């Protein structure tokens, strides 16, 4: 396989399970509609990187074709590395004949479902509805676009069903967080860019330092700090600001604050999703789930502080993610007071870590509610960063 590329730290990139699924679906559709066997498929990822992926386990019938793409994680220590992701594409006369009430219509003509080794959602709060296959929205879009491309090529206007499967999925899923998330029976099909960009912890923290150092050396004294793509998208699409003055910190909030102090930055504004940044209210400065997962404890305590009864607190403690917990707070009309007290604790811990030499602020958001809370100096910091005076 041709090397995909390397990160700035020299580590080999890989590709996601979403890319595997989209590539396998595209190849199966190509063979089904052309009647000819192919051994390699081209896929353009959302990141803009072209992949040329080898096909395995090809099985062709008159009305359906299946094939597999092997997952490659590069230098990322990913438990899904090396597994085969299968796609079966089948012609169907009418979508009403599809035998699964939990399948998903990607378009008027294309239906998607998961088979063996693809996890099923059993609890609310995830991207998919209960009962549906754990195939996230970006991979769904990738699969739809890939199959539609083939349909246009062969001027096919009939209905197709795509079924994904991962024979090793149930076993591999035991090594992931899926059981804790309420996803049973297999792995999730994931990915936001289609590409796996691995980083060792040291390489990642070194990169954070270098990114901030470059800003500083180019005359920037104030910057945004976001964990990753969600924060970056929020900057662009919701706050409508220039992301040139931003640094991705991943899970390393504490290290990033120390870097800012060491480099002599005047101030930083942290902007993050509640799923990560709620942990800051407990003083947790490395937000990776391996380090600590106090999300429900924080929300439960602050709900109790604002009048929630024991039953509500226990309900929050049983949630699998912050989206589900926020629905409970919304029902109890507690979002505003809880976010107010949460923000006070976040500010306390951030200011304690930053000290007097670094001005620090924070904006907390969710996909559903937008801005949930912000520090008193957040608007002022936004202005300073955009002006960089």
Question: Model regions: which residues?
Answer:
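Extended hydrophobic packing segments that form well-structured cores
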Residues: 109, 140, 343-389
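Short, low-complexity, polar/charged sequence segments that are solvent-exposed and flexible
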Residues: 60-63, 86-88, 130-133, 180-185, ...
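Generic N-terminal targeting/processing segments that precede catalytic cores or assembly contacts
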Residues: 1-175, 179-181
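Polar/charged alpha-helical tracts
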Residues: 152-153, 233, 237, 327, ...
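Flexible, glycine-rich phosphate/dinucleotide-binding loops
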Residues: 171, 232, 371
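A structural signal for small-residue-enriched, beta-sheet-centric alpha/beta enzyme cores
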Residues: 2-5, 12-18, 181-187, 192-342, ...
